[in-house]
Structures are given as structure tokens and as C-alpha cells.
């Protein structure tokens, strides 16, 4: 019989990563469920939580589970743990809160309660824009457009134009964030692969590919860039100057990034 020990196992790794509060919340969540199947996966959770390393032999000895049942039980446990963590994090994680509000709005929409759906979406959009969750903000606006077509009014055309401009602006924000975060990641990857630039040819190449791109954003006024755009700009500039061995400038941008982050610590959980 092929028994696995010391193997990387997704559900075991997830359990080991859980905080005490998350484990306690899972146990409370699990006890609300009923049935023999649920009792088995709670037993599996307790067994895995007690192990110092993943060991199927010990699991099968200690849990009322047959070997052929184990894969399905682990998959079920994995899903239920994620559900319980999602419920716990819903009150403190903005993207999860927004996802929940969008889902609520969709339920109301499907039931024909358009006014209630619109009210929830408006609050969710305000929250998404405040926390710069632009992808979800666009999803909300597109949903609002669908609701808007159900109420014909004189102001519909003007409102439609405003919404289109807002979506275009958010798409630009997302494009900028992706470009800046990708630049930082690419520069970090180059440093790991090659280290500091050693020749003038390497220096010229880095400046040509990344210098002009970052300078374009540096030229923007303070209010032109969002909090997230500016954060990734500082991060990319730090790696840009580090790989060029401009350590004083690198230090300057690292300090800016730290100061910038401290302005809105709630953005980083």
C-alpha cells in the first residue's frame, strides 16, 4: 500500500497556516452543519491540526475514514475551511465585502427589486472607489448600467455619457497600476537573474526600457495619480535605482514608499 508521509498537501498546509481565531471560527462554523459526513471532516481537521507533518498512515489510524474516502474528504474539508475564513474575513477585507454586496445586489435584481439593488450598488461603488478597487468598481458600474436601462428618463443620455467617462478613467487607472507593478516585478526579476548592471550597454538598456516609462509617471502632478499608482511608482523606482546601483536614490524611494504606505495603513490589512 502506497502511504504518503511528509508530502506537501494543500489542505494540511492550509490548516497549518490558520490562526487560532480562524481555527476557532472554523470549529464554530462546522458545528452548525449536521450529518455523518460533516462529523468525519471535523475529525479529519482535528487529526491534521495535531500532526507535525503530513502523514496519511497516522490520519487513517486516528480518523474514522477509509483510504478510498480520504481524497474526497480532504477536498470537502479544504472547501469548508475556505468558506469559514471567507465568512470571518468578510468584515475586515474590502474585496470580500464588495463581492458580497455585488452578490446581494444580483439576488435583488433577479427578484425584480431594482430600487433595492441600485441602493446597494451605489454604496458598494463608493467603497470600491475609496479603496481603489477599480476592477470591482467597473463591475459595479456595468451592473448599474444594466439597471439604468430599465428606467427611461430625460437624463439617461447624459448619465450614460458620465458613466462611460468614469469607466474609461478607471480602465486607465488599472492600466497604469499594471504597468507600474509589472515594471517593479520585472526589475526585481532582472536583479535576481543578473545582479547590478555592469556595463554601459546594460545601463543604457535599463534606462531605455524603464527610465522613460517611469519618468512619464514622475512628471504627473500629485493629484493625478491614485494612492495605488503612486505606491507602485515608488516601488518600481526603488528597484530601478537599485539595479543601476544608485543606492541613495533607491533609499529615497524606499522611504517614500514606506511614508506613503503609512498614510493609509488600512489598504494593506
Predicted segment positions?
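Hydrophobic/aromatic side-chain positions at a characteristic register within alpha-helices
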Residues: 18, 102, 108-110, 116, ...
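Start-of-helix signal in alpha-solenoid helical-repeat scaffolds, especially tetratricopeptide repeats
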Residues: 91-99, 138, 145, 177-181, ...
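Tandem amphipathic alpha-helical repeat scaffolds
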Residues: 104-110, 142-151, 183-203, 231-246, ...
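Amphipathic alpha-helical segments of tetratricopeptide repeats
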Residues: 122-130, 165-172, 208-222, 254-266
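Short, charge-rich amphipathic alpha-helical segments embedded
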Residues: 124-153, 261-268
Amino acid at each position: 500500500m502506497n502511504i504518503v508521509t511528509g508530502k506537501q498537501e494543500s489542505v494540511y498546509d492550509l490548516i497549518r497556516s490558520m490562526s487560532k481565531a480562524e481555527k476557532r471560527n472554523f470549529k464554530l462554523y462546522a458545528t452548525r452543519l449536521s450529518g455523518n459526513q460533516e462529523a468525519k471532516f471535523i475529525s479529519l481537521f482535528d487529526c491534521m491540526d495535531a500532526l507535525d507533518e503530513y502523514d496519511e498512515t497516522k490520519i487513517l489510524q486516528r480518523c474514522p475514514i477509509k483510504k478510498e474516502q480520504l481524497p474526497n474528504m480532504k477536498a470537502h474539508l479544504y472547501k469548508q475551511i475556505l468558506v469559514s475564513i471567507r465568512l470571518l474575513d468578510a468584515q475586515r477585507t474590502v474585496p470580500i465585502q464588495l463581492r458580497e454586496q455585488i452578490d446581494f445586489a444580483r439576488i435583488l435584481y433577479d427578484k425584480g427589486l431594482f430600487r433595492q439593488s441600485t441602493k446597494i450598488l451605489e454604496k458598494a461603488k463608493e467603497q470600491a472607489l475609496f479603496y481603489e478597487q477599480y476592477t470591482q468598481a467597473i463591475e459595479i458600474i456595468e451592473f448599474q448600467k444594466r439597471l439604468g436601462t430599465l428606467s427611461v428618463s430625460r437624463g439617461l443620455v447624459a448619465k450614460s455619457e458620465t458613466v462611460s467617462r468614469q469607466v474609461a478613467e478607471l480602465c486607465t487607472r488599472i492600466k497604469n497600476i499594471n504597468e507600474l507593478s509589472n515594471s517593479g516585478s520585472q526589475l526585481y526579476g532582472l536583479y535576481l537573474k543578473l545582479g547590478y548592471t555592469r556595463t554601459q550597454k546594460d545601463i543604457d538598456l535599463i534606462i531605455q526600457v524603464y527610465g522613460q516609462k517611469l519618468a512619464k509617471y514622475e512628471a504627473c502632478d500629485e493629484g493625478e495619480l491614485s494612492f495605488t499608482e503612486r505606491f507602485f511608482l515608488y516601488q518600481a523606482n526603488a528597484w530601478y535605482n537599485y539595479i543601476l546601483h544608485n543606492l541613495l536614490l533607491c533609499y529615497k524611494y524606499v522611504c517614500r514608499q514606506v511614508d506613503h504606505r503609512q498614510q493609509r495603513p488600512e489598504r494593506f490589512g
